[in-house]
């Protein structure tokens, strides 16, 4: 069975894969393979100062040990900077973006919503971030798991950064351009990115790009409520006995694997997941406590 489905897993090499990463990888992989779709791997290495040496290779080796097989070459965002630069220039020329010299201190007290201080200031680009003007509109989309999501860009976000003051490109810009460039039809990722999606929809609309389908899976969190991640020193995935974490990830996604699957090989665990995948079973919540899994 083949289909037009193209999915992707896009880790950030600021550390090694942990259980939360595995849940996202399993969800995106099974959602693609269950319908005969393609599954790509992309390194979101936008921020070199935060990248851990050797993490990219370690991530790929972990995916292989856990039975994942991706299609095509691994793409890297660090190789796409000229494409991002061209779009930033296009948006500046059209008046849809502008230079912003605001410091973090100036923006304290605005709850992350940009107040528009530089919107009509006409600053030069030197030593400035680039922000995208947003409309006073509510954006709406229906997530395959989380349901209807609404966000008023003007009131809840404000003009947002597409290129940082240090010249590095923002995630919101890069992810939209790369998903379009790679022909991604379905984005399956963690619910921590649900709030970013309306900004991405707006960019897709501005640039005349097609809108993929979205599925945001619950985020695995620690007892203190923080998500599993490199910032909180979450343990990396074990190198051996991959089927046990894979089976646990299947349970986190609402699937019903037999207990004995934890003793199988990694490829057998993923094959079971592909054969029995049912996205409607994924819990409709933003977070899942790790200790309950």
Curated annotation (Swiss-Prot):
Instruction: Return one Gene Ontology term, BP aspect.
Output: tRNA modification
**Record motif 'HIGH' region, residues:** 11-21
Residues at which ATP binds = 230
Q: Which UniProt keywords apply?
A: Aminoacyl-tRNA synthetase, ATP-binding, Ligase, Metal-binding, Nucleotide-binding, Zinc
Q: What is its EC number?
A: 6.1.1.-
The entry's Zn(2+)-binding residues are 100, 102, 114, 118
Q: What is the free-text note on the cofactor?
A: Binds 1 zinc ion per subunit.
Q: What is this protein for, i.e. what is its function?
A: Catalyzes the tRNA-independent activation of glutamate in presence of ATP and the subsequent transfer of glutamate onto a tRNA(Asp). Glutamate is transferred on the 2-amino-5-(4,5-dihydroxy-2-cyclopenten-1-yl) moiety of the queuosine in the wobble position of the QUC anticodon.
Q: What is this protein called?
A: Glutamyl-Q tRNA(Asp) synthetase
Q: Which gene encodes it?
A: gluQ
